[in-house]
């Protein structure tokens, strides 16, 4: 069996950097348990991935999309949770005043009115 070389794959992926990135990603997929699309023939995963690219059993566009998805970081965007202090402050403003506070305010008003008359 002839060994696969990079030259066999350059026809499919002209940029050698892209070829190396795609072959490395496919080799990691194989190592993770992805099914092979060519016979292994006692070759290691990087060689198998290059053979798959050369034989076009792995479409380059699909492989590129999978590689991009694997490199992307998913960030969840949720509404910020209100912290406990904000909740407490909001509850303080919405809460009706107790009768004691109302009577204190009323007494203070009466005292100020009485001082204003004198």
Swiss-Prot record:
Q: What is its EC number?
A: 2.7.7.6
Provide the alphabetized UniProt keywords: DNA-directed RNA polymerase, Nucleotidyltransferase, Transcription, Transferase
- A GO cellular-component term linked to this record: DNA-directed RNA polymerase complex
Keyword Transcription among record annotations: yes
Reaction(s) the record says it catalyses? RNA(n) + a ribonucleoside 5'-triphosphate = RNA(n+1) + diphosphate
Enzyme class name: transferase
GO molecular function ontology, one term from the record:
DNA binding
A single Gene Ontology biological process assigned to it is: DNA-templated transcription
**Listed InterPro entries:** DNA-dir_RNA_pol_omega, Pol_omega/Rpo6/RPB6, RPB6/omega-like_sf
Cite the SUPFAM superfamilies for this sequence. RPB6/omega subunit-like
Q: Name one Pfam family in it.
A: RNA_pol_Rpb6
Q: Which NCBIfam families match?
A: rpoZ (TIGR00690)
Write out the similarity annotation: Belongs to the RNA polymerase subunit omega family.
Outline what the protein does. Answer: Promotes RNA polymerase assembly. Latches the N- and C-terminal regions of the beta' subunit thereby facilitating its interaction with the beta and alpha subunits.
Subunit record text:
The RNAP catalytic core consists of 2 alpha, 1 beta, 1 beta' and 1 omega subunit. When a sigma factor is associated with the core the holoenzyme is formed, which can initiate transcription.
Protein's name according to its UniProt entry: DNA-directed RNA polymerase subunit omega
Q: What species is given as this protein's source? A: Paracoccus denitrificans (strain Pd 1222)
Organism lineage reads as: Bacteria, Pseudomonadati, Pseudomonadota, Alphaproteobacteria, Rhodobacterales
- The encoding gene is rpoZ
């Amino acid at each position: 069996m002839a060994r696969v070389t990079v030259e066999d794959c350059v026809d499919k992926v002209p940029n050698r950097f892209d070829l190396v990135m795609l072959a490395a990603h496919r080799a990691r997929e194989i190592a993770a348990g992805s099914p092979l699309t060519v016979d292994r023939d006692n070759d290691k995963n990087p060689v198998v991935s290059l053979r798959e690219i050369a034989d076009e059993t792995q479409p380059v566009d699909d492989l590129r999309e999978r590689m991009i998805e694997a490199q992307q970081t998913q960030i969840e965007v949720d509404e910020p949770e209100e912290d406990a202090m904000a909740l407490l402050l909001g509850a303080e403003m919405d809460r009706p005043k107790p009768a004691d506070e109302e009577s204190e305010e009323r007494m203070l008003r009466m005292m100020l009115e009485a001082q204003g008359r004198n």
